[in-house]
Amino acid sequence: MSRFILAFCSFIICLSCKNETKSIEALTAKEPTFAIVIHGGAGTILKKNITPEKEALYKAKLEEAIKVGYQILKNGGSSLDAVQKTINVLEDSPLFNAGKGAVFTNAGTNEHDASIMDGKTLNAGASAGTKTVKNPIDLARAIMEHSPHVMLSGEGAEQFATEQDLHIVDTSYFYTENRFNSLQKVKASEQVAFYDDTIKDSKFGTVGCAALDKNGNLAAGTSTGGMTNKRWGRIGDSPIIGAGTYANNNTCAISCTGWGEFFIRSVVAHDISALMEYKGLSIEEAAKEVIQNKVPALGGDGGIIGVDKHGNIAMEFNTAGMYRATMNANGDLYIGIYGE
């Protein structure tokens, strides 16, 4: 009888252990997280200088763009695809200084820069000074995946884009009256740099995206028309890996917008990642240290958007505003413009 009782007790204990194991498995087998964050430039973006109608246009385009990337991530797509397709939407809009809405150089031309980085492999691609590639972020990805190089520029980059069957357009495609008028204002004010507080809605025109997919892979990308009235083939931080764009699965994915010269000197995107990796800072702490302390100490302005490997979002800027939006795995949407 005692043997029977002992055997029965053993059976109950075993069954209990199995049920407990199943309960633990159920708890740990939750849906993988993902997140996406975008920006459309930072700068002297003041509510008093933007009409309600214009504000609505900006918010609508930010929402349209981020929902493209969100849907890709929700369906199990890669962070690279989400970043690229989201930036495509912003590049195709004349509202932002990238692609269609690119600013004018001193010579009256439009020159585009872009970069993209894969946090899983640390592969990256970038292009600078192109004039006929409709979507520079597509070129950056093609360089990353179909060339042995990281960065191509000018005519060589355009030749590669043609060989890759990317969308090539006439330079007139990039003309917008608003951007052309901005060039005339900057020239009239005798400002060499594009950051002129006396010009309404002066902003560091750049677009960017950072994303975490369900597989835990991070990616970031940035695209821009650069600086209004720029000369001599000037290139800012946007196509510079580590300065304007950086992604590493161990830490975070970052896209920057700001006064490019200072972001290059500060290696902003990589510095945030390094502070997380070597000092154990959170993405919020690292972003704040770089954007609120390090960059201003040199005299620079701007902001960043980023996401870490856990899906935590950072949107840090030291200017009056930054066009920005985020979405998480729950579908929660946030859109911001000013320093609220």
Task: Specify the residue positions occupied by each region the protein language model found.
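Sec-dependent signal peptide recognition
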Residues: S2-F8
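C-terminal motif of bacterial Sec signal peptides marking the signal peptidase cleavage site
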Residues: I13-S16
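Alpha/propeptide regions of enzymes that mature by internal proteolysis
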Residues: K18-E340
